[in-house]
Regions:
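Oxyanion-binding "anion nests"
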Residues: 233-278
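A generic structural signal for well-ordered coil/turn residues at beta-strand boundaries
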Residues: 240, 253, 292, 315-317, ...
């Protein structure tokens, strides 16, 4: 029976090529042969990697994909086909937050404890991280220090495997570049959020900066980390003003954030649990850097919703802003800006019809080259955005 996917528009395909680990690694990395590769996962108790004991616990479904699809895939032919070396599997203590720095301790299935900095980063050319929490930011920093390449694929599920990791990333890259060229060097972007009959507008100041793309290709000698599934145009805002509604991921509480000077400075209650809003207010008071708006991102791909932000933020018609660190994106919000290390996260706030049905993205517009262009209306690409990829 054919799988029926949840899509944002009829333009999204319902059929994709079968997943191929060999094709994915070849397209993303263009390996020359001889590269030493390893796989990383996160666990609440990383010693559970011994004898792959974590496979007996159904809560580690993401990590099971790392073992069943990637580790076994390499071992059962892909390493030989691509002339890879290694193929080892390591676990580390789960960080508990998106893009928090990783611990140095790594654990192997044979029970050994190793050091990432001494035993792993210097000795691998390609590192694949399949985890619960994103490790893109810390791995990007380590890649620059030690010269390896890699990919982060947090939150993996079957839909992601069958769709977002099965597409042709040469095509994804080409389309992302077309969109980037039509959106780069914008002066600002304004987003109109509609909720409960009211419209709230957030302006993100870009000052003509060069737009960047997450396009899935990580080729050549330069150290880099691809975030997969890919397909995104993004900026690191230089300022922001206005307000926007926020839906809490844990309990669905809706609040209205006030933004000034590029950061969230206050938050007020709309509906749900008032204690959730009070906790957010307290966090902003204690560690103001947690409110910094470090990213504005637009999805570029025609993909189905997976229920995981890692894919869903890459869908054309969705938009996300992110708070916190953005050094992995070329921004200046580094972990040392935060009063508490545990707060130095990069948290995407995704607006998509399946995730935030209470909030409509009525319009997104861009000021560029002296004129305004409408990019998105009601979660669908507007004529200008469509024209960039036709």
């Amino acid at each position: 029976m054919a799988t029926s996917y949840n899509v944002i528009s009829p333009e999204v395909p319902q059929h994709y090529p079968p997943f191929s680990l060999s094709r994915l690694l070849t397209t993303v990395f263009h390996p020359k042969g001889g590269e030493r590769v390893c796989i990383l996962i996160d666990l609440d108790d990383p010693t559970k990697v011994k004898d792959f004991a974590f496979l007996n616990d159904p809560q580690w479904s993401i990590q099971r994909y790392a073992h069943d699809v990637f580790y076994n895939g390499l071992k059962n032919g892909v390493s030989q086909e691509l002339n890879f070396q290694g193929g080892e599997f390591y676990a580390y203590q789960i960080t508990g937050g998106s893009n928090l720095d990783m611990p140095d301790a790594a654990f192997a299935p044979d029970g050994r404890q190793l050091s990432f900095e001494k035993d792993i980063y210097p000795h691998y050319d390609l590192i694949l991280c399949i985890s619960t929490f994103s490790a893109t930011a810390p791995l990007t920093a380590w890649a620059k220090k030690f010269g390896f390449r890699g990919a982060t694929m947090h939150g993996m599920n079957q839909t992601i495997l069958e769709t977002g990791l099965s597409v042709d990333y040469d095509t994804v890259s080409a389309e992302a570049e077309k969109l980037r060229l039509g959106m780069t060097r914008a002066d600002w972007v304004e987003i109109d959020f509609a909720i409960n009959g009211n419209t709230h507008t957030l302006r993100l100041v870009l000052n003509g900066q060069e737009a960047q793309k997450s396009h899935g290709l990580c080729r050549g000698p330069e150290p880099d980390i691809a975030n997969l599934p890919a397909g995104e145009i993004y900026y690191t805002p230089e300022g922001a003003e206005g307000e926007f509604p926020l839906k809490n991921e844990h309990d669905g509480t809706l609040s209205l954030t006030k933004v000034s000077g590029g950061r969230i400075v206050d938050v007020s209650f709309i509906s749900g649990n008032e204690e959730t809003v009070k906790a957010h207010q307290q966090k902003l008071r204690e560690d103001p850097a947690t409110g910094d708006l470090g990213e504005l991102g637009f999805g570029t791909q025609l993909l189905p919703f997976s229920g995981r932000d890692i894919q869903d933020e890459k869908i054309r018609g969705t938009i996300h802003v992110a708070t916190g660190r953005n050094d992995h994106l070329g921004g200046g919000f580094t972990p040392d800006k935060f009063k508490k290390a545990i707060n130095a996260t990069h948290d995407d706030i995704l607006f998509a019809p399946h995730k935030t049905p209470e909030i409509n993205i009525a319009q997104v517009r861009m000021q560029r080259d002296g004129k305004q262009e409408i990019l998105i209306e009601n979660y669908l690409p507007a004529a200008y955005m469509k024209s960039l990829v036709e």
